[in-house]
Amino acid sequence: MSPQIIELLIFAIIAFYIINKLITTLGSTSEEEQIKNKSYFGEPVIKDVTYSTVKDHKKVERNVSRTQDIKVFKDIIVENNINAVVDGIEQIHKRLYSFDPVKFINNAKTAFQMIIEAAYKKDVKELSELIDKRYLEEFEKIIPSYGDFFDSSALSAKYSEIYMFGNNIFIKLLFQGKNVVDKIEDLQEEWTFTRNANTKEVDWFLSNIERV
């Protein structure tokens, strides 16, 4: 056998070994990728280029959160307005992260008492700190109809509406109770409190009253 033929055979054996090694390696890699790209149920996992899985997950989270909100807050929201008010609460949270619906209700009841007592004492300074200056004159017209504050335990409050107009937040609360004040036996009024979402000041002001 000539040296050339022997040399060709050697190259052929080397080439066969290299090709076989490549096929084995590539085959193994492909198989591993198939295993990686299968779920526990064995179906292939498709890359989610639209991020719909993430969106769906967030949607589920939002729905769960909303359901929890409705369960937690239903006792402090007027029954017919639950969905609209929960929407409003979510809207406020986007602007005021520290907003606490339950705490706000309790503080509003305290503000109600402070306003009525200040009105009865004709404390203009305190009223000016609690009432929007654009509404103060209108409020002064109805002061005589309240008399003095009588019983805080009889006063209840529920959210009836929440909305934004520009950067201003408006929260309307339904105050109810019997003999809460001297001159109104059966109190049923909607008080609107407002504040600017962009200001650093955290004060809310009474901006309107409707008797229902």
From Swiss-Prot:
SUPFAM superfamilies documented for this protein: NTF2-like
InterPro entries listed in its UniProt record: NTF2-like_dom_sf (IPR032710), Tim44-like_dom (IPR007379)
Domain of life: Bacteria
SMART domains given in the database record: Tim44
Protein name: Uncharacterized protein RP434
Organism: Rickettsia prowazekii (strain Madrid E)
